[in-house]
Regions:
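Entry/capping segment at the start of metal-dependent catalytic domains
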Residues: 3, 38-132
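Extracytoplasmic
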Residues: 93-96, 118-123, 132-140, 151, ...
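Amphipathic, coiled-coil-like alpha-helical scaffolding segments used for oligomerization/assembly
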Residues: 157-217
């Protein structure tokens, strides 16, 4: 009887002690009535879990960033390069000037000219100020009569058609005195893809027109890729009017890229940069980092703060020529990061909102 009492007391004590131990599981009792305590599980501290999650996320971001950088570098490396003479070296601490042309293909070339990448109606000097910010864009109409070195007086587009980018750079440098540091060409065959990549672009048209069967109404028009090209290449317009539309299209496209940060947003950067690089040809002196930097700086040309102007012209003996009384101030303004100041002084040269 004493043995039974002792055994019962011992079991009761063990049971009581077991109740006090963390981790006992009453449901784990064996058929003999014995209890097997489950191992104690240490609670993970929330901050440790957060660190693990954060570390994994950062690792993923870095991997994506590294892959994105490699892909961007691949895109930039694939941009065609062209040898261009007469380019001025970049002076440290000073601004840079780029000559942009737009290769023209399709039914709107002047009679007798064969469509080629060396025919352009758009000649745009884009200036980056010494502080790295976009200074503005200056368009010289392609049908302006200028002195083409070694060829006499011809429309500006003649220089590009006859001697390629080198003669175009030489001609504009001779006429303006502005050193040109780099050259880039936009291929209108790929403008549609670029416009589609940014989700279309809005332009304002002063009166209803029709081009290639596409009707454009007066006011704001939302253009897709193909309709943007139709808008810029309308054969019913004069060459000067088409040049103005191309200038407006470039301005409004860059405005959307810059204002919506499409080149810095990871969700849009690759598609936009892919379309942009597909449309570009640059001079062989431009490094990949310079091309990437240029793409970002071009975004700075977007918005109301951007300055787009057209060189002043006048008719002399029925021919379109530059107006030196005004344009000489413009050339000086480009060299001294003063395009905005020039535009304020000569508002009539500012590119209109509607074209």
């Amino acid at each position: 009887m004493s043995d039974i009492t002792d055994t019962t007391s011992q079991a009761s004590a063990e049971s009581s002690a077991g109740d006090e131990r963390s981790g006992d599981d009453r449901s784990s009792a064996t058929h003999h009535g014995e209890y097997r305590p489950t191992p104690h599980r240490r609670k993970r501290r929330p901050w440790r879990v957060a660190l693990v999650v954060l570390g994994s996320f950062l690792g993923l971001v870095l991997a994506v960033a590294a892959g994105g950088y490699a892909y961007v570098n691949h895109l930039v490396s694939s941009i065609p390069r062209v040898n261009v003479a007469y380019l001025a070296p970049v002076t440290p601490g000073s601004g840079q000037t780029f000559l942009f042309t737009a290769s023209a293909y399709g039914p709107t070339e002047p009679s007798g000219l064969t469509p080629s990448p060396n025919y352009s109606e758009l000649f745009m000097l884009i200036h980056i100020n010494a502080n790295g910010k976009a200074g503005g864009a200056v368009t010289i109409p392609g049908d302006t009569i200028v002195n083409v070195p070694g060829h006499g007086s011809h429309p500006l587009y003649y220089a590009l058609k006859t001697g390629g980018p080198s003669l175009a750079v030489h001609t504009i440098t001779t006429v303006t005195g502005v050193p040109i540091n780099h050259y880039a060409r936009i291929d209108f065959n790929h403008v549609a893809g670029l416009v589609n990549a940014i989700g279309g672009v809005q332009v304002t048209i002063p009166k209803a027109t029709t081009a290639f069967g596409q009707t454009f109404h007066a006011g704001v028009n939302q253009l897709t890729g193909v309709t943007a090209v139709y808008y810029a290449r309308d054969p019913s317009l004069s060459q000067s009017a088409r040049t103005l539309r191309q200038e407006v299209l470039v301005r409004d496209t860059l405005a959307k890229i810059g204002n919506e940060h499409l080149l810095t947003n990871p969700l849009t950067m690759v598609s936009v940069l892919n379309a942009l690089t597909s449309a570009l040809t640059v001079d062989s002196n431009m490094t990949n980092s310079e091309v990437t930097s240029l793409a970002k700086q071009l975004g700075g040309l977007g918005g109301s703060a951007a300055t787009f102007v057209t060189a002043a012209t006048q008719k002399v003996n029925g021919k379109l020529v530059l107006n030196p009384a005004i344009d000489n101030q413009l050339w000086t303004a480009i060299e001294h990061d003063g395009i905005a100041g020039f535009a304020a002084k000569y508002p009539s040269t500012v590119t209109p909102q509607a074209a």
